[in-house]
Amino acid sequence: MAITLQESLRGLFYAPFYVALARGAYAAEGVEVDFESSPTPGQAAHGLLDGSVDVCWGGPMRVMETYQQVPGCDLVCFAEVVTRDPFFLVGRRQAADFRLTDLAGKRFATVSEVPTPWMCLQEDLRRAGVAPGSLE
């Protein structure tokens, strides 16, 4: 029997899973994995609820959102995969001495498919003394 594993989105921080799949590590341990991509990041949790997938990866924010949307939701998070804040900023120019405070008043775009990167950055900004609303 195979386990259907669904990724919610393609991310660099999930590289160990991609490597394990490509190198046959699951099969070497006797685990058959059918790997799928979710149509959208938000639909991964719903695949668990409707039984179309056995397990998916994603963050706790996705589970909390699903709890708000689906009465009686019983999803649980387990097996931490990514520790700390795995997201990164990409700038137009090199900034060797970059500080989060440099973002104040700057035009900024965040990923829109998932809420977690912006939520993490907002907290980082607040800790650096920058109001998230000061970014354009």
Q: What do the predicted segments below correspond to?
A:
Residues M1-E136:
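Short, glycine-/small- and polar/acidic-enriched structural segments
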